[in-house]
């Protein structure tokens, strides 16, 4: 369904089935982990849930570096190491949180309680909440279906690009949304409109503080990042360029993806789960419209006449680069989702913008301009990454990331931003 054409290759189809069987139990473990994390967050215990995702990264690294060579055989057999890594990570993530649950006396055996009014209320609120929070993931899933019709590698390029966005989103966007939800709920229950506005305002500012420079950094450093991390073995310079196209498209929407993680809790804290669903449905439909519209534009611009003569499906299956449309469409639909939520939030009159936004945005803009100037200067001075060795790439990338980050931080401090501004929600 999501990788059409794979079933014509028995070996590849068998490998995918094996990986699916290995990783499917991860869904159970990660769901229980999320439940445990939600319980801990409700008791203001944020550290353990925030650290838990690191376990998956460590297991993936261990699977690729340690387990894969020990499986021996062909690369197709060695890739099963990553499946085992995902399975192990799911179990370890759950076990990692159990001591913290025991510390707050919440580690109990599961039991049925469907008749409890609290459980029934959670079930009523949960379904629309799941959809409203998953629009970006659903869009990406639909994008992979379309990418399967494009040239070979499009799905992988799109998936790898999504990994680069998950770092700032997972570390900062999700973390801010997680921290801010209990505060917003507390202010709403106590009818503290001032406190509600103050907490949401703080979340919005912190999100922009991270997501805007992260977006610009990804746009400028996409190829250096991909070349340094992935361009080895069978991953060629061509794959680097194609993955970078996906990063360009998706990273354009990074501020919207991150702001959604903060704006959605403003609705959930008030137990309003219907409004995010309305916005999500609109974004979902818009994403498909954007996908086909942008594919049509790129088809006319990028596909040569000799390929067009073979028919549309044959042409899009051979012309590389068309997957750029999918990344841009996801970004545009996320901005639409954010815009609708922002409009409806304003109509509820529960949020009043705090003073100082004009000066804050100006400082943010100037700091980003300084960072971009520094990165462009370094990129002009450094040789092409495709021509460097592995260690040269690592050193050059460290210089770029460190130099750009330091320039941004110094510029913000020079314009009056202080570490204490990170507090105050």
Model region roles, listed by residue range:
Residues 1-425:
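Membrane-embedded alpha-helical bundles of multi-pass transporters/translocases
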